[in-house]
Swiss-Prot record:
Family from the record: Belongs to the herpesviridae UL32 protein family.
Protein purpose: Plays a role in efficient localization of neo-synthesized capsids to nuclear replication compartments, thereby controlling cleavage and packaging of virus genomic DNA.
Record's signal peptide: none
Source organism (scientific name): Varicella-zoster virus (strain Dumas)
Chain intervals for the UniProt region annotation (Zinc finger 1): 107-193
PROSITE patterns listed in its UniProt record: HERPESVIRUS_UL32
UniProt GO cellular component terms: host cell cytoplasm; host cell nucleus; viral envelope
Protein name (Swiss-Prot/TrEMBL): Packaging protein UL32
Gene: 26
Binding site for Zn(2+) 2: C408, C411, H484, C491
C-alpha cells in the first residue's frame, strides 16, 4: 500500500481536506466498495453510519455565545466597557459559512479533485464513476435529499479509489468544515462546474462566441448564488433581539427589508440576466424550435409508459424506499405541518443523531479545523436543532407562509421512480376529481383521503411502500401539495429538471459490463447538459427572492408581468403568480 503524508495546509485549503485513515475515522462497511458504483443509490447510505451522522450534523447551524444588551445595537454592544448579557446566536456561523457563495470564492470541490489528481492521479474507472454522479446530478431536482446524497457519494467515490491504496479519507472533512454542504450545492447544483451547455440545453454557441457565453453564465451563477446567500443570511436576524441591526442588511427606498445590497442590485437586473441564458428569447430561438420546458414535458409523457413497464418487471427490495425515509428524517418538523407517529419518530431520531455525533466527535473534529471555524468547536458551542438540517435545503431559509415552507417535501419524492409516476397520477386524479367547477384546492383533500384508503395504493405497477408516500403527502399538507403541483415555479422547474430516463433507465449491476460501458461513454462524450435553461432558473430564484424579501406592490406587479411573459413563451401554466408570491414561500 502506498502511503502519503498530508501537507498542512494543502493547496487551496486552510486546513487538510483529507485525513489519514484510522480504525475510528472512516466507518465504511467491509463490503462498501465491493459492487459496481451506481450514482444516487439509496443503498449506499447504509454503508457508513459515521459519514451519515457527520453529514446530518454538518447540515445544522452552530450556536455560539455572544454578548447583547437591551436597547443597544450590535456594533455598540461590542464596545469596550459595556456590561453585556450573554446569549447564544447562529449569526457568526451563518456569516462564515455563507462566504462559500461569494462569486470570487474558489470551488472547494474542484480544488479537492485537483488536489487528488496532482497527488495521486485520477484513474479511468474513477472518471467514469464521477461522470455518472455528474450526469444524474444534472437530472435530479434540487432538494435536501439530493444534496445529502451528492455529498455522501462524493466522499464515497473518493474513498472508494484512494482509501485502501493511499490511506486517506474524506470522512470527517464536513465536520471539520474543510468542505461544506454549500460547496456541494454550489458545485453540483448552483454553478454546476461540469456543465457543458452554457446554460442553454441543445444550443451550441456560434464560433467565436464561447467566451461571451461563459460570461453570461457567470452572471447567472452570481445571481442564483446571491439569492441563496441572502436567504441564508436572513436566518440570523430571526434569532436577534429586535433592537439589534446587522451590518449586511439595510432598508431600501421601498421602505422594506431588501436583503443584502448585492442581492438588491442583482434583482434590479434579473430580466437582463435571464434573457441572456433563456432559450425562448429571440436571440437563441429559431423558427419551429421548441423550448427546453416543452421538450421536457414531451419526453416525460413518452417515457412514463416505458418506466411503468420497467417497474412491472423489476423486483424491488426494501432499500428502494431509502430516499423516502431520508426525506422524512431530514424534513419532518421542517417542511411538514401535520404530525403523526412517523414524523415524530423522524424528528426524535434526527435530533438525537446530531446531538450524539456532536458529543462523541467534537474534540476530534476540532483538530485541523480552519481558523475561522475554530470558535464553533468550543465547549460553549452547540448545534442549533430548531431549524433542522437547513444547510441541505435549496434556499436555506426558515420562513413559513400559508402553511408552506421554502423546502418542498414533494420535490424530494421525484428522485424515486415509483413516486415520480405516483405524483403524476396523483395530479391527474385531482384534475379529474370533479366534473364541475370545483376549485383545484378543494379537490386535494378528497383525493388524499381516497389514496389513503388503498393499501397498497393501486397503480399500474407494484407499489407496496408500506404507506410512505401517503404519509409524506399528508405530513406536507394540502397547501404544500397545491403549491407544488399547481403554483410554485421552483417546484415546476424541479419536475421539469427531473429526467426519468437518466435517473431510472440506466444499466444496473445485473449486467456489470453494460453498466461499466455506459459510464465510460458518459465520461468520453463529456456532454453534461441541463434539462432546463438557466433563464428559467433565473426567474425561479428571482421569484423566491421576491417572496422572502417583499417589495412594493408596483415592483411586484412589474415582476409578475415580466415573469408571466417568460412562462408563456415556455408554455408553463401556473395558478396565479400573484397569489403564490404573497401567500406562499
Amino acid at each position: 500500500m502506498d502511503r502519503v503524508e498530508s501537507e498542512e495546509p494543502m493547496d487551496g485549503f486552510e486546513s487538510p481536506v483529507f485525513s489519514e485513515n484510522t480504525s475510528s475515522n472512516s466507518g465504511w462497511c467491509s463490503d462498501a466498495f465491493s459492487d459496481s458504483y451506481i450514482a444516487y443509490n439509496p443503498a449506499l447510505l447504509l454503508k457508513n453510519d459515521l459519514l451519515f451522522s457527520e453529514l446530518l450534523f454538518a447540515s445544522h447551524l452552530i450556536n455560539v455565545p455572544r454578548a447583547i444588551e437591551n436597547n443597544v445595537t450590535y456594533e455598540a454592544s461590542s464596545a469596550v466597557g459595556v456590561d453585556n448579557e450573554m446569549t447564544s446566536s447562529t449569526t457568526e456561523f451563518i456569516e462564515e459559512i455563507g462566504d462559500v457563495l461569494a462569486l470570487d470564492r474558489a470551488c472547494l470541490v474542484c480544488r479537492t479533485l485537483d488536489l487528488y489528481k496532482r497527488k495521486f492521479g485520477l484513474t479511468p474507472e474513477w472518471v467514469a464513476d464521477y461522470a455518472m454522479l455528474c450526469m444524474k446530478s444534472l437530472a435530479s431536482p434540487p432538494c435536501a435529499v439530493v444534496t445529502f446524497s451528492a455529498a455522501f457519494e462524493f466522499v464515497y467515490l473518493m474513498d472508494r479509489y484512494y482509501l485502501c491504496r493511499y490511506n486517506v479519507t474524506l470522512v470527517g472533512s464536513f465536520a471539520r468544515r474543510t468542505l461544506s454542504l454549500l460547496d456541494i450545492q454550489r458545485h453540483f447544483f448552483l454553478h454546476v462546474c461540469f456543465r457543458t451547455d452554457g446554460g442553454l440545453p441543445g444550443i451550441r454557441p456560434p464560433p467565436g462566441k464561447e467566451m461571451a457565453n461563459k460570461v453570461r453564465y457567470s452572471n447567472y451563477s452570481f445571481f442564483v448564488q446571491a439569492v441563496v446567500r441572502a436567504a441564508l443570511l436572513s436566518i440570523s436576524t430571526s434569532r436577534l433581539d429586535e433592537t439589534e441591526t446587522r451590518k449586511s442588511f439595510y432598508f431600501n427606498q421601498d421602505g422594506l427589508t431588501g436583503g443584502p445590497q448585492p442581492l438588491a442590485a442583482a434583482l434590479a437586473n434579473w430580466k437582463d440576466c435571464a434573457r441572456m441564458v433563456d432559450c425562448s428569447s429571440s436571440e437563441h430561438r429559431t423558427s419551429g424550435m421548441i423550448t427546453c420546458a416543452e421538450r421536457a414535458l414531451k419526453e416525460d409523457i413518452e417515457f412514463e409508459d416505458i418506466l411503468i413497464d420497467k417497474l412491472k418487471k423489476s423486483s424491488y427490495v426494501e432499500a428502494a424506499w431509502g430516499y423516502a425515509d431520508l426525506a422524512l428524517l431530514l424534513l419532518s418538523g421542517v417542511a411538514t405541518w401535520n404530525v403523526d407517529e412517523r414524523t415524530n419518530c423522524a424528528i426524535e431520531t434526527r435530533v438525537g443523531c446530531v446531538k450524539s455525533y456532536w458529543q462523541a466527535n467534537r474534540i476530534e473534529n476540532s483538530r485541523d479545523v480552519p481558523k475561522q471555524f475554530s470558535k464553533f468547536t468550543s465547549e460553549d458551542a452547540c448545534p442549533e436543532v430548531a431549524f433542522g438540517p437547513i444547510l441541505l435545503t435549496t434556499l436555506k431559509n426558515a420562513k413559513c407562509r400559508g402553511r408552506t415552507n421554502t423546502e418542498c417535501m414533494l420535490c424530494c419524492l421525484l428522485t424515486i421512480g415509483h413516486y415520480w409516476i405516483a405524483l403524476r397520477q396523483f395530479k391527474r386524479d385531482i384534475l379529474a376529481y370533479s366534473a364541475n367547477n370545483t376549485s383545484l384546492f378543494d379537490c386535494i383533500e378528497p383525493v388524499i383521503n381516497a389514496w389513503s384508503l388503498d393499501n397498497p395504493i393501486k397503480l399500474k405497477f407494484p407499489f407496496n411502500d408500506e404507506g410512505r408516500f401517503i404519509t409524506i403527502v399528508k405530513a406536507a399538507g394540502s397547501e404544500a401539495v397545491y403549491k407544488h403541483l399547481f403554483c410554485d415555479l421552483l417546484c415546476a422547474l424541479s419536475e421539469l429538471q427531473t429526467n426519468p430516463k437518466i435517473l431510472f433507465a440506466h444499466p444496473t449491476t445485473a449486467d456489470k459490463e453494460v453498466l461499466e460501458l455506459y459510464k465510460a461513454q458518459l465520461a468520453a462524450q463529456n456532454r453534461f447538459e441541463g434539462r432546463v435553461c438557466a433563464g428559467l432558473w433565473t426567474l425561479a430564484y428571482a421569484f423566491k427572492a421576491y417572496q422572502i424579501f417583499p417589495r412594493k406592490p408596483t415592483a411586484n406587479a412589474a415582476f409578475i408581468r415580466d415573469g408571466g411573459l417568460m412562462l408563456r413563451r415556455h408554455a408553463i401554466s401556473l395558478v396565479s403568480l400573484e397569489h403564490t408570491l404573497s401567500k406562499y414561500v
